[in-house]
């Protein structure tokens, strides 16, 4: 249930919004943000999902309301499907143990998907705001949380213009899990990297002083990108050869993976956005479903390897190659780039 007093604000201007039964609006009424099924819509652009995708999400939400959220996933996608496993695997939320969460924390999760992180996150926090660019997925996340008895979740559709529809300095933690590489994909006015930089600046803006940003994204120079002979696929589904994929990766134009960066480049982007005290983690064996988060300093990498039972890759080639990578270089070729970064005000440090 949306309350009249929230952290929602007009994207771009930051202007306070008035709330009514139909949604949110600016005080002069010139900008309107309608609410559908409890989900306000702050999207700047029309949806890019095709008709089949839209209809699938409509079916999913109808099934969720009548049969329950988990039964709807089974009915629409099948219990053995990759998407069912992906959005019900509790291990995907393991990174929450690394975050400074408590029963007073107000958290923003950007990119809720189908609520796979939102629900366990809400169990640990006072209040969770979720933002998702696909309205059908946002509605499913809200329904999933309601059916789980989580009344402390507010989900909105928005962020496609790399603007966050929230007031400044409102959140203790902002979570950006496997979103950064895609965050500017729908923004039509600026280049992708400029959109990503704007997105990081927005995350900095909405955090409280001393708040933390969690970023987990793909690594342009991961071993899998560079050496996995399976290659990948382009946006039209065609296979890419290993060499072509490597060359695309090197220049940051592997569209199948979104716009990705090196460890050093992303570090610089976070610092330029204002973040400090960057902590980096190696999500092993892979950043989507990790079983371990290892600090990337050489001593921690060596200790994790020596402890045994560490799976160092999710493909045959990466499992063979990663143990050979010197500890100081692991952060450069690990599957994903994972950071916990802190906001300080100018001149504070």
How would you label these PLM feature ranges?
Residues 279-348:
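A C-terminal cap/extension of S-adenosyl-L-methionine-dependent methyltransferases
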Residues 116, 120-162:
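Class I SAM-dependent methyltransferase SAM/SAH-binding core
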Residues 162-174:
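A short acidic, Gly/Pro-enriched loop at the edge of an enzyme's catalytic core
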Residues 214-240:
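Conserved class I S-adenosyl-L-methionine
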Residues 82-105:
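Conserved alpha-helix/loop element of class I SAM-dependent methyltransferases that forms part
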Residues 257-274, 280:
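Short alpha-helix
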Residues 193-212:
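A short glycine-rich, Lys/Arg-flanked "PGG" loop and its adjoining helix->strand segment in the class I
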Residues 4-6, 16-76:
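N-terminal, positively charged/glycine-rich alpha-helical extensions of SAM-dependent methyltransferases
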């Amino acid at each position: 249930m949306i309350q009249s007093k929230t952290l929602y604000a007009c994207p771009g201007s930051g202007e306070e919004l008035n709330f009514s039964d139909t949604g949110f609006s600016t005080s002069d009424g010139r900008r309107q943000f309608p609410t559908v099924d409890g989900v306000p819509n702050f999207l700047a652009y029309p949806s890019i999902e095709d008709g089949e995708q839209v209809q699938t999400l409509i079916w999913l939400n109808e099934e969720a309301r009548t049969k329950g959220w988990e039964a709807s996933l089974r009915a629409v996608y099948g219990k053995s499907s990759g998407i069912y496993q992906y959005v019900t695997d509790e291990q995907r939320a393991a990174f929450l143990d690394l975050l400074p969460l408590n029963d007073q924390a107000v958290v923003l999760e950007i990119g809720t998907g189908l609520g796979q992180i939102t629900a366990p996150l809400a169990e640990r926090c006072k209040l969770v705001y979720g933002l998702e660019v696909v309205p059908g997925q946002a509605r499913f996340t809200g329904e999933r949380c309601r059916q789980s008895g989580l009344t402390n979740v507010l989900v909105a559709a928005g962020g496609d213009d790399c603007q966050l529809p929230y007031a400044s300095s409102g959140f203790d933690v902002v979570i950006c899990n496997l979103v950064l590489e895609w965050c500017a994909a729908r923004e039509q006015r600026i280049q992708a990297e400029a959109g990503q930089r704007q997105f990081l600046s927005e995350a900095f803006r909405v955090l409280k002083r001393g708040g933390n940003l969690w970023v987990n994204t793909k690594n342009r120079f991961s071993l899998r990108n560079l050496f996995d002979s399976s290659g990948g696929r382009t946006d039209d589904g065609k296979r890419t050869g290993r060499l072509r994929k490597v060359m695309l990766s090197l220049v940051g134009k592997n569209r199948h993976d979104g716009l990705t960066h090196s460890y050093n480049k992303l570090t610089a982007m976070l610092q330029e956005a204002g973040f400090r005290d960057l902590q980096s983690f190696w999500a092993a064996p892979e950043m989507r479903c990790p079983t371990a988060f290892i600090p990337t300093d050489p001593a921690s990498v060596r200790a994790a390897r020596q402890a045994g039972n560490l799976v160092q890759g999710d493909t045959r080639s990466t499992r063979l190659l990663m143990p050979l990578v010197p500890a100081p270089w692991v952060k450069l070729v690990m599957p994903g780039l994972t950071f916990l970064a802190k906001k300080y005000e100018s001149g504070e440090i």
